[in-house]
């Protein structure tokens, strides 16, 4: 019988290994093309801005977001697993290549996070 302590240690080690592999795969091998993504991002600019900074209160900022996260969210909108009125119109027309390119472009945008005074 494996002790609870040993099981916990195995869980922590496997989690850390998985996270490090995910981080390495996301930062080393980008599947998308940043330049192609910028051209495709023209369709995103009304809500998210060409710079990935939201132009409306209902659209999130996506500049500098982690690439695998953007890919996963666009795929979820495309499949219908995630719902949003605007994205439900746009996402179904995106190819896998479009999704990879858009994610590469928006994740490559450098942002500066500034702490608000008094917070």
Q: What would you call each of these model-derived segments?
A:
Residues 28-30:
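Signal peptide processing junction and immediate N-terminal pro/mature segment
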Residues 18, 24-26:
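N-terminal signal peptide c-region/cleavage motif recognized by signal peptidases
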Residues 58-61, 71-78, 88-92:
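A structural feature that tracks compact, well-ordered secondary-structure segments
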Residues 34-45, 63-72:
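Sequence context surrounding c-type heme c attachment/ligation sites in exported
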Residues 32-41, 50-53, 82-119:
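Flexible coil segments in periplasmic/lumen-exposed cytochrome c-class electron-transfer proteins
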Residues 2-16:
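Bacterial N-terminal signal peptides that target proteins for export
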